[in-house]
Design a protein with these regions (language model features):
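Generic recognition of well-ordered alpha-helical segments
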Residues: 200, 253-256, 295
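C-terminal tail/cap regions
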Residues: 1-15, 20, 232-233, 262-312
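Intrinsic disorder
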Residues: 60, 84, 244, 283-286
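A generic structural signal for short
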Residues: 33-34, 242, 281
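A short C-terminal helix-loop "cap" of Rossmann-like NAD(P)-dependent dehydrogenase/epimerase domains
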Residues: 175-178, 231-240
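C-terminal helical subdomain
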Residues: 90, 190, 214, 237-278, ...
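Rossmann-fold NAD(P)H-dependent dehydrogenase/reductase core
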Residues: 3-228, 302-311
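Polar helix-capping/helix-linker motif
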Residues: 86, 174, 260, 282-285
């Protein structure tokens, strides 16, 4: 289990918090984009980056949600609406930044949805895959021209890419999710896509000083146990405290990958507990990553025209 793993070579590990990661880091004059910034790991990420002096561009599904972040951010905070399941929303968001001439030092692709019990689609694409991967794929590619020379892109993946993904990896003929939809496997596929996107992006950035890395934040403690009966809840809470992280710990790895000087120039890696970690065999499959990039471009082009995707 991650919790019982040794502290990594850099002295950081399971219990390390985002504040501890950044204790000696001054982010003044840095501009960092965070998606899914209004709750959970995203909110803690904004708080700590703001604490260290960064200008944070906090993206959320609605402008009301983005504005709700202001009380925990510094005066430089910029709220933006960005619904990652809606191409027109992504375009409006990126055009706002392009027109403002904003230079971006880091993008943290944090937003995500998980294990929808029933199949949900938008533009003919299963919603977890659309939101978690395609939306971020479109956002990052539209912002590339704004990145500084040493910009870092951090994609929040998950160990679910190993645990829950389909046996054959990405189901290139089933982005609709129609074929035997499984909530966990669909989520695992989206997290594998995050990892493959990061790796292929790193390959494409090779030769520059810009980097791309993926991270596993850990399993985060939530209020999902509130409906348990008292006896079961007591036992579940004990297990939760042993195996789950709080948000302060959960945000540490994505902030580490996005800001820490020790990994300046490091690219194409997968981090967990603020240390490099191995992936599944599919996570290292470069051909699958290239194929996913090609399909992602096709899907993005199709849905940007308001047309539904049809499985091929």
């Amino acid at each position: 289990m991650d919790r019982f793993a040794k502290i990594g070579p850099n002295g950081l590990g399971f219990h390390t918090t985002a504040e501890e990661v950044t204790r000696s880091i001054d982010l003044t004059d840095k501009t960092i984009v965070v998606t899914g910034a209004n709750s959970g790991l995203g909110l803690e990420t904004v708080r700590v980056l703001s604490l260290r002096g960064a200008k944070v561009i906090g993206m959320a599904r609605t402008i009301e949600k983005a504005n709700s972040i202001k009380p925990i951010a510094n005066a430089l905070f910029m709220p933006l609406e960005c619904d990652l399941s809606e191409p027109s929303s992504i375009m409006r968001c990126t055009q706002t930044l392009i027109k403002s001439g904003t230079q971006i030092d880091s993008i943290i692709c944090n937003a995500g949805i998980m294990a929808l019990p029933q199949l949900q689609q938008k533009y003919g694409v299963e919603l977890q895959f659309l939101t978690n991967h395609i939306g971020h794929f479109m956002l990052v590619n539209q912002l590339m021209a704004l990145l500084t020379d040493e910009a870092r892109i951090t994609i929040v993946s998950s160990s679910a890419h190993k645990v829950f993904a389909y046996p054959d990896g990405i189901q290139f003929d089933n982005f609709s999710g129609f074929n035997k939809y499984n909530p966990q496997k669909a989520y695992g596929q989206s997290k594998l896509a995050n990892l493959l996107f990061s790796n292929e992006l790193a390959n494409r950035l090779n030769g520059s000083h810009q980097t791309a890395n993926a991270v596993h934040p850990g399993v985060i403690r939530t209020n999902l146990l509130r409906h348990y009966n008292p006896i079961l809840k007591y036992g579940a809470v004990l297990v939760e405290k042993l195996l789950f992280k709080n948000v302060h710990q959960g945000a540490a790895t994505q902030i580490y990958a996005s800001t820490h000087p020790d990994i300046k120039g490091v690219s194409g890696k997968y981090f967990s507990n603020c240390n490099p970690k191995s992936t599944s065999r599919h996570g290292e499959d470069q051909m699958m990553g290239k194929k996913l990039w090609e399909f992602s471009e096709k899907i993005a082009k199709t849905i940007s025209q308001g047309t539904d995707w049809e499985d091929q």
